Regions:
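Acidic glycine-/aspartate-rich tracts in secreted/extracellular proteins
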Residues: 63-65, 86-90, 99-104, 139-144, ...
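Extracellular/periplasmic catalytic domains that process cell-envelope and extracellular macromolecules
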Residues: 48-53, 75, 88-90, 126-130, ...
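Chymotrypsin/trypsin-fold serine protease catalytic domain
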Residues: 14, 105-106, 133, 138-139, ...
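Active-site region of chymotrypsin-like
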Residues: 54-65, 71, 143-149, 193-228, ...
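Protease-domain processing segments flanking chymotrypsin-fold serine proteases, especially trypsin-like
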Residues: 1-82, 95-100, 212
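C-terminal subregion of chymotrypsin/trypsin-like serine protease catalytic domains
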Residues: 12, 17-18, 23-26, 58, ...
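Conserved H-D interstitial segment of serine endopeptidase catalytic domains
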Residues: 60-63, 81-84, 88-126, 197-199
């Protein structure tokens, strides 16, 4: 995969956050349109993170058409944040908070920067949800510390790794209650297991893209799988970006779908 095979385009488009994508009938429709999926991903009944133990986490907030949007992201260099395309598409600018545990507290460790420079993958299409990846360029380089640090990305030698069967975790400030959709002030996490994409295809009734990873919660856990854009991490390495879950709710046992980071290693401007 050549360095120039992918290119950036400035994020533009309509607001599709908090919109459930579903169909009323499966008759006569392609498989990709048959499944009901949600663009919202939230951690339900997750555990609170030890404060500042995940210094790579970024909280991404913006307002689109008078609607406040909250996403997750990860710091991949001192001036770049990795997130999902859906988190910046349609936005004119975003607030990126680093070094946070409790978003409602004025923690000394927190830094909030406003960026209007963010890019989505040129092949991203909301209807298909493939290539759901974007990079936010911060206006200045941030000082790295025990509170703000970059996350490790896979090596090129990891491109063929499916990670199936491996334990992973995802974190975010998303919902803690599937019914009331209450957001969490503090960073929370959930342990997951990477599962074969075939299991996702059974759940969602359409063929998964080659750039996607599926992960499920441990047996008996009623969760969704993290804020959109949040990193999926295996052994301290980010292998995925939270993309979407089921429209039927966060406690219905559907796996979460994540963008596969290894597919985009040569696309990232590092």
């Amino acid at each position: 995969m050549g360095k120039n095979q992918f290119s950036f385009v400035t994020a533009k488009g309509c607001n599709f956050f908090n919109v459930h994508i579903c169909t009323k009938s499966n008759a006569g429709k392609p498989a990709a349109e048959n499944s009901e999926k949600s663009s919202d991903l939230e951690i339900i009944d997750g555990q609170e993170v030890v404060p500042h133990s995940m210094p790579y986490m970024a909280a991404i907030r913006t307002v689109i058409n008078s609607t406040s949007i909250l996403c997750g992201g990860s710091l991949i260099s001192d001036s770049l944040v990795l997130t999902a395309a859906r988190c910046v598409d349609g936005a004119s600018e975003v607030d990126v908070t680093l070094g946070a545990h409790n978003l409602e507290d004025n923690e000394d460790s927190q830094i909030t920067l406003i960026s209007s420079s963010f890019f989505i993958h040129k092949d991203y299409r909301h209807s298909g949800l493939a290539d759901d990846i974007a990079v936010i360029e911060l206006p200045v380089s941030v000082p790295l510390s025990r509170y703000i640090a970059t996350i490790k990305l896979p090596e090129l030698t990891d491109i063929g790794n499916t990670y199936e069967g491996q334990e992973a975790l995802v974190a975010g400030w998303g919902g803690v209650n599937d019914v009331e959709q209450v957001k969490s002030n503090v960073l929370r996490y959930q342990n997951l297991t990477i599962i074969p994409v075939e299991m996702c295809e059974i759940s969602y009734l359409f063929k998964m893209q080659s750039d996607q990873i599926c992960a499920s919660a441990p047996l008996g856990k009623n969760i969704c799988l993290g804020d959109n854009g949040s990193p999926l991490v295996v052994n301290g390495v980010q292998i995925g970006i939270a993309s979407y879950g089921s429209v039927f709710g966060c406690s219905m046992g559907f796996p979460g779908v994540f963008t596969r980071v290894t597919k985009y290693l040569e696309w990232l401007p590092l």
